[in-house]
Amino acid sequence: MAPKPPSGTSSRAWDAVTPALSEWVLEAMSSMGFTRMTPVQASAIPLFMAHKDVVVEAVTGSGKTLSFLIPVVEKLLRLEEPIKKHHIGAIIISPTRELASQIYNVLSSLLAFHPPSAAAINPSEDDDAPRPKFPSSTLKVVPQLLLGGSTTPAEDLSTFLKRSPNVLVSTPGRLLELLSSPHVHCPQSSFEMLVLDEADRLLDLGFKETLQNILRRLPKQRRTGLFSASVSEAVDQIVRVGLRNPVKVMVKVKGGSGVDDKRTPASLQMTYLTTPPSHKFAALKRILSSVQPTPLKTIFFVSTCSGVDYLSAILPLLLGDDFLLIPLHGKHQANVRQKNFNRFINSHDPAILLTTDVAARGLDIPSVDLVVQIDPPSDPKSFIHRCGRAGRAGRRGLSVVLLHPGREEDYVSFLEVRKTPVVPFSPLITFSDADAAAATATARKAVLADRALHDRGQKAFVSWFRSYSKHQASSIFRVSDLDWEALGKAWGLLKLPKMPELRNFTGDKTLGVSLDWNNYAYKDKQREKRRKELLQEAAESGATQSTSNKRRATESVAWSQQAESKNKKLKRREQKKSKHEKARWEKMTEEEKQKVLETEKMVEELRKKNEEERRLRRAAAKAAGAKADGDDEEEFQGFD
């Protein structure tokens, strides 16, 4: 048996928790290397175990997962009798597949120290080494992981009916599908706890209606815990989820002044590097080489999925063979995401995960040494979560955000106000135009070799610009300050994209590149064959490229102006309609006018009658629902 964690007068000793933790939990914590609780665990675990609803805000990487898993497990194993078959005792909801998988894995690792639960989770298939048998009356925790994309709802239900789990770890959509089955039960007699992990992101990602439907299927007499790194920014929505006088736990980190003014771990050093647009990607290699020892796990954040697709082909050429670069974004197929994620976390060589904000929240990627934000996030809330992928669980980490000279440097003051201060990157990195030119030449060489990569680059650049233009700190990240030519060259583009926003650009849209576009080919033979066929058809029909360009130009309207244009068209249409109606009315006889007025009156009366009937039906349905519920509390009506 592993030695117990150190005890004593410290309130952060595992055996100092009240109510006391089970012996097997203490053994698990010691064996897993957790000698004492983190501040958030010391605050949240006793409250959640003492039947309190909790809202927990703590810095990323502070141990929030065990803060809810331990109370959930302890609660279910202290019931007077086992939970009935096909009844659920606890639910843990996560915003992403990856985070749900990690929560499930941590829970399984914890339950491996509880023999009855371990035997139920992994029944022995080896007759030579059978697991011990336990009576059916033995209390145990049996979890099930629900993920869309890897299994079908029917397969999930089949697994549920076969194994009868009492804890569900799931993303919102797949959970709702399972709870909709008449074979799945969550009565007040068995359901104990609900956990929303990364709670504010669950609300931000469009899960409001799904969560509303889930909560309506759960009993009101339950314990609820909400955990996140930035709960305070979504409190107005979260407090309406159905918590009963929740206790708010907020754990912050002392800054250099000794004041609790930081929202990131003390072990995480957050820095910024000012670099001209043309030197941005060339600077990445300098950053990697200046960090000692060489980072084994690095994450590069960019703003869009298209950016990941394009840069995953370009950056390996600029960084050399010393690092394995692995792409990951939300539009990848589920199996591709899982495969690439596993490649990164299991790599024994220096590896870089090139990703979007899909990896910014909740993912417990072990031993991340360095985070580089190539693109500052459009939503400032994401900044802390991106940085927090490094410096987890007390491990030292470094984060760097790249900023353009000028107005973007005001982002440093902006972050300080948000209690996420950054300092200049050290050691000082110098840039040369020769380095930038060499990086551009390397990228363009790859683009010239395959027209498909050129297409990807054009799409990526447009999507990057649109993300930049929607930055919430728009007074800092201003489109009018962008150096288009420098950006295009840094990306290795052969020309600037045909964007309505560049219609009045007077610079060099060719970026100094002279190219025979008719003979610029795709590597893929089928795509190249199709391109040549279209080119031939255009030549035979007499449709020249310039005519095509003019037609597209007249049809193209800046996406930022489309709403205004539609409103103008609608207004003109209404004015024209009013004018036409007035002329028609003047041509009518008195008898015709009387018939029109009578018809309009009848239509209005019918409309009012229908509205009254709908109002009465809603009132009756509401009254019936209240009677069936038999509860004098307000029904949960959603977040808005």
From Swiss-Prot:
Residues 630-640 have a biased composition (Acidic residues). Residues 521-629 form a coiled coil. The gene is spb4. The keyword RNA-binding applies. Residues 568-582 have a biased composition (Basic residues). InterPro entries: CTT_SPB4, DEAD/DEAH_box_helicase_dom, Helicase_ATP-bd, Helicase_C-like, P-loop_NTPase, RNA-helicase_DEAD-box_CS, RNA_helicase_DEAD_Q_motif, SPB4-like_CTE. Residues 45-249 form the Helicase ATP-binding domain. Belongs to the DEAD box helicase family. DDX55/SPB4 subfamily. GO terms for cellular component: 90S preribosome; nucleolus; nucleoplasm; preribosome, large subunit precursor. ATP-binding RNA helicase involved in the biogenesis of 60S ribosomal subunits. Binds 90S pre-ribosomal particles and dissociates from pre-60S ribosomal particles after processing of 27SB pre-rRNA. Required for the normal formation of 18S rRNA through the processing of pre-rRNAs at sites A0, A1 and A2, and the normal formation of 25S and 5.8S rRNAs through the processing of pre-rRNAs at sites C1 and C2. GO terms for molecular function: ATP binding; ATP hydrolysis activity; RNA binding; RNA helicase activity. This is ATP-dependent rRNA helicase spb4. A motif (DEAD box) lies at residues 197-200. It comes from Neosartorya fischeri (strain ATCC 1020 / DSM 3700 / CBS 544.65 / FGSC A1164 / JCM 1740 / NRRL 181 / WB 181) (Aspergillus fischerianus). Component of pre-60S ribosomal complexes.
